[in-house]
Amino acid sequence: TMTDKATGDTLYRMSFCTLFQEWQATEEATRVRKSFENVFLVPMPAAPAEITVQLYDFHENVAASLKHPVDPKDILIRPVDGKPQTRMLLNSGDSKEKIDIAILAEGYTESEMDIFFKDAESTVENLLRHEPFKSMSDRFNIVAVASPSQDSGVSVPREGLWKKTAVDSHFDTFYSDRYLTTLHLFKMHDALAGIPYEHIIILANTDTYGGGGIYNSY
């Protein structure tokens, strides 16, 4: 929740889930301590504001809370300038009025970008076959973002296969064979700098069934 520092008025509010919260339910979490990257997308306030982040447990009780002040005039807020190569796959209008989805390339080398854009087009076609996207397609903008990887494909730890890719995704998350995720959210959002987006689809260059989704994350 973002509130105006002077008046206390609520400026912005969103709910979220994280891979960290899922990890908390694993057996590993009973034995070791870990930290996870996370990113919150919030509008830049026009005046000093305060952001409150509350983490709830499985019983919907507040388990942790933190507050962070934001001053738009703070000289240490560094802008991230980005001009990624993009291709608009569905353009329904002004991003201020639409839900913007970014499809991010993962495991596609520079020479495979044409393949990525074709795969992204196929992804959109399949997405729009299903509700609510089918009947509400005019409410969405979808853009494909070329984020080239050094290696082709994605990492499979159980096979000893580690690739150098755009957002360092890998299978075997939480030791589940099919679970393909990334822990590197800073890289993911930096790759999208300069374009409007609310939701992210990481399109991995693999034929292996798998993946996952985290509410309001990716």
Could you say what each language-model-derived stretch is?
Residues 60-75:
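Edge beta-strands of extracellular beta-sandwich domains
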Residues 31-35, 44-48, 94:
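Surface-exposed coil/turn segments at beta-strand junctions on protein surfaces, enriched
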Residues 139-216:
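Active-site-proximal segments of metallohydrolase catalytic domains
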Residues 124, 217-218:
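Active-site recognition of the HExxH zinc-binding catalytic motif
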Residues 1-39:
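N-terminal prosegments of processed precursors
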Residues 40-41, 46-61:
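Short, aromatic- and glycine-rich surface loops/edge beta-strands on solvent-exposed regions
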Residues 74-134, 144-154, 160, 186-195, ...:
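Fold-level signature of zinc-dependent metallopeptidase catalytic domains
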